[in-house]
């Protein structure tokens, strides 16, 4: 702030405020000067008395100037003995000189010799800076020149003048320290530590004299500590010298820039426990040394991941109301959000899905809590209520406010009566204040503008019209009651009366009393004339006397409102503040100590003018980035990231891959769970409209083969209405329709654990549809053929479902009321022994084994019958366990044959024995055909030991027939060559074809 602005600020303040600020500054000055004594103080009353005494001594009312010398002096503590100069080395090397310089700078040593005498004679003030002495011997100090003394005196005088100017400006204002303020002697002492000046009367010593001086310096360095101790004691005894030694002078240049000083020595800091300080000193130090934290860097645009939480004016706010976790668990079980969200007509966002997932997590937690509670492992403390995200995000309506008020009235109905009483009391007090103080206590509002002249004329004409019209019904009544003969006479008199009444009305408005008397007389006359007529009509109808309503009250009898008192704002505020019940207190009413404490409090900053400034930003820092406030309506999150160095994304939006995008490599065609084949015969086709097909394709592109989400989006309707079979949209039905619409669909594209079941289901459905000649697959209906057929099919399916339900209810077994129910015999029941239980288990296992054998035998007989008829095709589905090609002579293949899987094919376990036995079935075949068939039969029996020999021979014959003629001839040649030698030569690497090779060759044909 500039000096001009400060002058304006001080000029605008009153003298009382300036005196109060001066008192605060004096209290702070006293506390800072006594900071060393206040650390261990316990009696706060004594401190308050001392502060009051100090303020009384330096008050401006008594016209006493401030005596700076009377202030308490800041005396630093003595340096501990371990930090004193050690005298291990007797040589005055440059490193020791530097060390001594630093140690002597921290000590309170006053200048000795002639300098002490000069200081005592001058009586300098306390705030004058102390010159740091050089490390010199006693001889060099005595031989200092008079010029240095004169320069030192002149520099001290300049410093004293500057300090006086500084005090004259402000007690707290500080002048900038420049290099010119430092005395030249000090600069010379630091910059030239080795040069010694001699007086004019004394000549410079020779080389021999220099040697003697060096020897004397070495001798003096041994006794340096004792001399300094004596100097310290001398300084403490002299009050003036101690006053001058209260402050130290700091050199203008750093020590690293001085001549012959390259590196300073730093002693280790002694470790000590921090002493507790009084609360007043800590608060003052915190206020002085506290710096404002920068919560927002406006110029720094390269801030990465900087999160700022900005509050609104009404923060902190009330948290949203919570619900018990049991209620949320019940709602999640009855109406889960995962089922309700897809039925909404709005867009499906990530927040909605996260809300549903959080609800499921809460359900799991609640079930775990219930389990622990049953096991007596859960505490009896009530768990924290969870805020329902649905009710918290809904806007508050008038109905919600009424419900909240009703709930509050239910809790405490009598409190509403107290609230009404308090409101009435407040209104009564406001009325009393209005009639006591006048319009001063009223709220200042904008005055109502006076009406224009045109509006006044219209209003006056309307008033006259109403007055005249009020007489018209009386005239009509009189005319109707009077005879026709008297009508002419009465007409003129009535007109005159009307004119008189109008004149009387004008006169009465001006405040004349004659008008009122005339009205009274006319009213009496009117009553006398109409008494007879009213008596006749009173028996017939009850009437109202209008004359009494038109009668005007005498203005003299009107109640005149008393005049309001006129009071000034100062008087009103003074009377209001004199009340014993107040919410605030003025600082002037406190004592000096109380005012100092209240000003130094850091927590209660409402009394400070800086805190009243609403434009200053309030720091709000979250504990973590992952923690956000629960009340999101009153908090905003701003995220700043570095966007200067980042290049724009070169990948177009169409190529970006998200969680539900179908162009991701991890999104394969995974079919849903296939329905059971048991109900395939009773399956009805589903009808798909063109709009349904478009929505299906859109959902598939959006959710990437997530059939559960696709089904929930397709079946977006209420659960209460009836849905027929042809209108259902299950995940499998959506997948079926996708297979129909996709022309490039291939069964091999399906992946996942459910792909095999889906392939079987599609194959069986296609086969059944060809056999029954009835449609099972979904049916696409165009817009032209949908008018009647679709509706008819839907109603037909509805009636079919009703018929099945009625039939099922009729066929259900009904209890026979005539047959008595046998009582449950509990006495004859006996608990089985362990032996009986083991026998029952053995019998059950035996029955299961017998059933398995029967089923296996029936299956084998069925396969043999199919082989004999030639109906069983040679496919992997009918014979998936046929042997594979392997080396028949390898030992490893024999070992693998024992542990083979259905895809592995073990070789023959023995050598083939070629015999000359002719086949019994067909004599046209070669002689070695039987051996080939037997070899195949042995392979089949070796792989499937549960096969019978007949079934193996039939399978071998079928395999041989499926071979081409060239392969059969080659096999016969191989077997003929094998029959001659007993040992197969190693050069022969030909082996019999495996069933897998046979299948591949058959498929190639």
UniProtKB/Swiss-Prot annotation:
Q: Which UniProt keywords apply?
A: Activator, Chromatin regulator, DNA damage, DNA repair, Nucleus, Transcription, Transcription regulation
Domain HSA: where? 386-460
Q: Where is the composition biased (Low complexity)?
A: 126-170
Q: Name one GO cellular component term.
A: nucleus
Q: What PROSITE patterns does the annotation carry?
A: HSA (PS51204), MYB_LIKE (PS50090)
Q: Polar residues: which segments have biased composition?
A: 171-180, 198-209, 481-490, 874-890, 915-926
Record's superkingdom?
Eukaryota
> According to the UniProt entry, which residue ranges have a biased composition of type Basic and acidic residues?
75-85, 519-539
GO BP: any one term: chromatin organization
Where does this protein reside within or beyond the cell? Nucleus
- Annotated region Disordered: where? 72-180, 193-214, 222-241, 468-543, 807-844, 874-930, 981-1005
Extract the Pfam families matched here.
HSA, Myb_DNA-bind_6
Recorded GO MF terms: chromatin binding
Q: Which stretches make up the Myb-like domain?
A: 684-744
Q: What is its main location?
A: nucleus
* Role of this protein: Component of the NuA4 histone acetyltransferase complex which is involved in transcriptional activation of selected genes principally by acetylation of nucleosomal histone H4 and H2A. The NuA4 complex is also involved in DNA repair.
- Quaternary arrangement and interactors, per the entry? Component of the NuA4 histone acetyltransferase complex.
Q: Which family does it belong to?
A: Belongs to the EAF1 family.
PANTHER family hit by this protein:
E1A-BINDING PROTEIN P400, E1A-BINDING PROTEIN P400-RELATED
Protein name, UniProt field: Chromatin modification-related protein EAF1
- Origin organism lineage: Eukaryota, Fungi, Dikarya, Ascomycota, Saccharomycotina
> What is the primary gene name for this protein?
EAF1
